[in-house]
Regions:
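Short amphipathic alpha-helical surface micro-motifs
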Residues: 1-4, 12-19, 57-63, 113-114
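Long, acidic, intrinsically disordered low-complexity segments
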Residues: 9-32
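Low-complexity intrinsically disordered segments
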Residues: 1-15, 136-145
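Short, surface-exposed, charged amphipathic helix/loop patches that serve as local interaction elements
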Residues: 25-32, 36-145
Length: 145
């Protein structure tokens, strides 16, 4: 059991837990990248970063008001993309410059994701990240494990 715990804890760096995502439109491969599973803390960090908080005067504390879903999804995709692919795609300064020259406002890797992935493509990538991260595993599979 101890060895199993140790191996299970390494899911974020385990290459067997990764999946290649290909962005194909009209039969043409535009680009591809590899994603990995995320831990709860990574999901939470992305959510907090893109949630607007307001101070509740009655309770004297900040409460979440609204989460920017578009930025949140892009942050999840960015976080789940392996480092090598993040550097080649989302953080590539040449890509930023070219997109800026086309009139798109690129300030960071999240902006590249927003402009380069269609809404439905982002949803599908998020689904794959969730599956890799252990969401939507059937009860039967959990019982087997």
């Amino acid at each position: 059991f101890i060895q199993g715990l140790i191996e299970a804890a390494g899911f974020a760096t385990n290459e067997d837990e990764r999946k290649r995502i290909e962005i194909v439109r009209n039969g043409r491969l535009f680009f591809a990248f590899t994603i990995r599973p995320l831990c709860s803390e990574e999901y939470d960090t992305c959510k907090k970063k893109h949630t607007k908080y307001v101070r509740n005067k009655q309770l004297g504390m900040k409460l979440p008001e609204d989460t920017n879903r578009v930025k949140y999804q892009s942050a999840i995709i960015y976080q789940a993309t392996i480092k090598e692919d993040r550097e080649k795609l989302w953080d590539n300064k040449k890509v930023w410059a070219t997109l800026n020259d086309q009139g798109l406002q690129i300030m960071n890797g999240l902006d590249v994701i927003e402009y380069c992935l269609k809404a439905g493509e982002k949803d599908k990538v998020i689904e794959e990240i969730d599956l890799l991260s252990g969401f939507e595993i059937g009860l039967e599979e959990v019982a087997k494990n």
